[in-house]
Amino acid sequence: MYLKDSKIIVIKIGSSLLIDDKKKVRRKWLTEFAKDIQELIKQNKKVIIVSSGAIAMGCKKLNISKKNLKIDKSQAVASIGQIELMNLFSETFVKLKINISQILLTLEDTEQRRRALNAKRTFDNLFKLGFVPIVNENDTIATSEIKYGDNDRLASRVAQISGADSLILLSDVDGLYTHNPKIYKNAKLIKEIRNIDKDIEKIATKSISEHGTGGMKTKIDAAKICQLSGCQMVIANGLVNRPIKKITEENKCTWFLPKVSKLDARKKWIISSVSPKGALIIDDGAKQALSNGKSLLAAGIKKVSGRFSKGDHIKVLDKNNYECARGLSSFSSNEIEKIMGHHSKEIEKLLGYISKSEVIHKDDIVEV
């Protein structure tokens, strides 16, 4: 499909695209990028921009280095830089009559289904009003425990929530190479990836840019989420003028094709949870039942790992600790420890109150 047939497109911009190594804002680049957005809008495509740069812009304003910033200070710097960042977008986009809005998200906003659905409605309403949402992680309130840490994975969740057809990750590299192209001259660009296997993960290398926190590993993680959400993803070099136009004309990039055409919206959200709260280790019989589309019952659970509450995302592991599924638990970890290994009819007696018979209902579990 690539971009031609995409109705909703999410575009992620890295900090290194907005600010160069000398801490100068790339205004000319942003103007050319805005022309790409204008062209997409003319094609009746809905666009969301996920932009890094709040902390980088804050550091520029304060004339300090981003390196070794502690999280409390980085939150203050982000607060300063966020205004600078949005002013930059506003000044540039208004010249092309592109209306923009701002959305700040945290990890919890995409992990909790109610918040995720609220975000979806907000995106839909902004599209109807003719606005281009500009999204960033809310660095001013996010802590290390509830933080994405990079905008690649945030962009993949935004793509998932908004129902996007394509996610474009613009970076300082052309895509995924067989080796690090900055070191090996014989490195070859991988044009298309259908399956992210161990070999693909192995060759993912870290970015060495001054302002970016991502690197190829986080882009691979983002691709996994997209592939399981029916969304295609592309990694492309954004340092060129008109980067979106370059993708369509030259295709010098790496495309990750979706594994599925469509997943139930609820299961999309379950499968790509960034931070499962715990895990259940199950026996072979329970694993086979899951493969047959059945619910997970207490009788097949051998061990509980971690502390979690009813409704939390959890992993399901087989006896070899291999992740075979993810789901939403109908019980807390304390409750499961009391009922595991027992028949469903015994649950009321063991807990002292009436509850569900399934630890994870079949509608709330997805095999991985």
Curated annotation (Swiss-Prot):
SMART domains the record matches: PUA
Pathway terms, separated by semicolons: Amino-acid biosynthesis; L-proline biosynthesis; L-glutamate 5-semialdehyde from L-glutamate: step 1/2
Keywords: Amino-acid biosynthesis, ATP-binding, Cytoplasm, Kinase, Nucleotide-binding, Proline biosynthesis, Transferase
EC number per UniProt: 2.7.2.11
Pfam families linked: AA_kinase (PF00696), PUA (PF01472)
InterPro entries: AceGlu_kinase-like_sf, Asp/Glu/Uridylate_kinase, G5K_ProB, Glu/AcGlu_kinase, Glu_5kinase, Glu_5kinase/COase_Synthase, Glutamate_5-kinase_CS, PUA
Subcellular location field: Cytoplasm
Catalytic activity: L-glutamate + ATP = L-glutamyl 5-phosphate + ADP
GO biological process, one term: L-proline biosynthetic process
An example molecular function term from Gene Ontology annotations: glutamate 5-kinase activity
Domain PUA span(s) in chain numbering: 277-354
UniProt: ATP binding residues: K12, S171, D172, T213, G214, G215, M216, K217, T218, K219
Chain residues that bind substrate: S52, D139, N151
Domain of life: Bacteria
GO cellular component annotations of the record: cytosol
Disulfide bonds: none
HAMAP family in UniProt: ProB (MF_00456)
Similarity field: Belongs to the glutamate 5-kinase family.
Role summary: Catalyzes the transfer of a phosphate group to glutamate to form L-glutamate 5-phosphate.
PANTHER family to which the protein is assigned, alphabetical: GLUTAMATE 5-KINASE (PTHR43654), ISOPENTENYL PHOSPHATE KINASE (PTHR43654:SF1)
Official protein name in the record: Glutamate 5-kinase
Organism from which the protein derives: Pelagibacter ubique (strain HTCC1062)
The gene coding this protein: proB
